[in-house]
C-alpha cells in the first residue's frame, strides 16, 4: 500500500515538473535581457535616490551596491527563478522610486558590508562588546 502511494506521488511530481511553464521568459536569453533592463533601470535611478533621500553615500557607492546585489544572483540559470528575482527587483525599484521606502530602508542595504559582530566570549571581550 505504501509503495503504491509513493509511486503515485512520484508520478504526480514528474507530471508537475514537466508541465511547469515559465513566468515571463521563454528561455534563458530572454530572462537575461530582462535582468539587463532591470539593472539599467536601477543604475539610472541611483542618482535620483541619493539626492532625493539625502543618503550619506556617493552615487558611485550606490551603483557599486546595485552591482553587488545583482552579482549575488549571477549563478542562477533557471529562467523561472530569474523571472521571479526580476519581479522582486522591479517591486523594490518601484517602492524606491515612489518613496514608499524611507531612508533607513535604503540604507539597510549598506549594512551588509560591515564586519559581523563576534560570537564567542573572547572575541567580544577583545572588541569591547558586552557578552
Curated annotation (Swiss-Prot):
The keyword Membrane applies. Keywords: Electron transport, Membrane, Mitochondrion, Mitochondrion inner membrane, Respiratory chain, Transport. GO terms for cellular component: mitochondrial inner membrane; mitochondrion; respiratory chain complex I. InterPro entries: Complex1_LYR_NDUFA6_LYRM6 (IPR045299), NADH_Ub_cplx-1_asu_su-6 (IPR016488). This is NADH dehydrogenase [ubiquinone] 1 alpha subcomplex subunit 6. It comes from the Eukaryota. It comes from Mus musculus (Mouse). CDD domains: Complex1_LYR_NDUFA6_LYRM6. It is found in: Mitochondrion inner membrane. The keyword Electron transport applies. Belongs to the complex I LYR family. Signal peptide: none annotated. Pfam families: Complex1_LYR_2. Mammalian complex I is composed of 45 different subunits. Accessory subunit of the mitochondrial membrane respiratory chain NADH dehydrogenase (Complex I), that is believed to be not involved in catalysis. Required for proper complex I assembly. Complex I functions in the transfer of electrons from NADH to the respiratory chain. The immediate electron acceptor for the enzyme is believed to be ubiquinone. It is a peripheral membrane protein. GO terms for biological process: aerobic respiration; mitochondrial respiratory chain complex I assembly; proton motive force-driven mitochondrial ATP synthesis. Disulfide bonds: none annotated. PANTHER family: NADH DEHYDROGENASE [UBIQUINONE] 1 ALPHA SUBCOMPLEX SUBUNIT 6, NADH-UBIQUINONE OXIDOREDUCTASE B14 SUBUNIT.
Amino acid at each position: 500500500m505504501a509503495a503504491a502511494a509513493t509511486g503515485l506521488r512520484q508520478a504526480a511530481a514528474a507530471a508537475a515538473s514537466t508541465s511547469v511553464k515559465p513566468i515571463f521568459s521563454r528561455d534563458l536569453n530572454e530572462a537575461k535581457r530582462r535582468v539587463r533592463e532591470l539593472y539599467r533601470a536601477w543604475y539610472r535611478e541611483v542618482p535620483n535616490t541619493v539626492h532625493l533621500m539625502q543618503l550619506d553615500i556617493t552615487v558611485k557607492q550606490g551603483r557599486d551596491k546595485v552591482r553587488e546585489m545583482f552579482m549575488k544572483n549571477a549563478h542562477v540559470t533557471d529562467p523561472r527563478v530569474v523571472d521571479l528575482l526580476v519581479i522582486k527587483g522591479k517591486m523594490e525599484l518601484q517602492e524606491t522610486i515612489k518613496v514608499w521606502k524611507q531612508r533607513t530602508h535604503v540604507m539597510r542595504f549598506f549594512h551588509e558590508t560591515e564586519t559581523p559582530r563576534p560570537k564567542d566570549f573572547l572575541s567580544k571581550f577583545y572588541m569591547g562588546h558586552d557578552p
